[in-house]
């Protein structure tokens, strides 16, 4: 009787471990991301990280997936503190802010011209003023217009302008 209960308990434990939604992951393969820049040009979305990783795609989700595939490890998009949307002709802005890989607290900025994610990271870490992803999600759902702060400058010399 004790053996059958023990065997049943072991079988239940093994099944729970095999079918558990939690999977182990090698933390050394995670690539930290502080800043993400996304731009739309010539019909293609381009995502760049502060570490120099790039991804391209027909929509934001495809560009993020391409960046993940081409990276030497697993980019930790959820650790990004800043997201810069370059160029004003992005049609899929609402699709972008609802990507599950983005942390709700990530601050969003816009830029009239493409900026280098690596260059702008130190500046934004000192001068945080963006609108959070969660605030933008709420605005998209309610139809509220939100002005994003604009990053202006280049080559390590940046400033934050009032949103438009």
For every predicted segment, state its role.
Residues 1-164:
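Membrane-proximal alpha-helical signals and transmembrane carboxylates
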């Amino acid at each position: 009787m004790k053996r059958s209960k023990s065997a049943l308990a072991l079988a239940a434990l093994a099944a729970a471990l095999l079918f558990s939604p939690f999977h182990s992951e090698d933390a050394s393969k995670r690539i930290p991301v502080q800043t993400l820049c996304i731009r739309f040009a010539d019909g293609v979305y381009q995502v760049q990280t502060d570490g120099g990783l790039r991804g391209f795609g027909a929509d934001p989700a495809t560009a993020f997936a391409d960046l993940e595939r081409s990276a030497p490890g697993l980019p930790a998009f959820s650790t990004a503190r800043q997201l810069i949307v370059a160029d004003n002709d992005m049609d899929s802005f609402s699709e972008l802010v609802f990507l599950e890989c983005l942390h709700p607290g990530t601050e969003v900025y816009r830029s009239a011209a493409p900026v280098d994610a690596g260059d702008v990271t130190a500046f934004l870490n000192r001068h945080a003023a963006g609108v959070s992803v969660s605030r933008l999600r709420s605005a998209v759902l309610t139809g509220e217009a939100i002005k994003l702060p604009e990053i202006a400058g280049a080559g390590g010399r940046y400033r934050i302008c009032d949103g438009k």
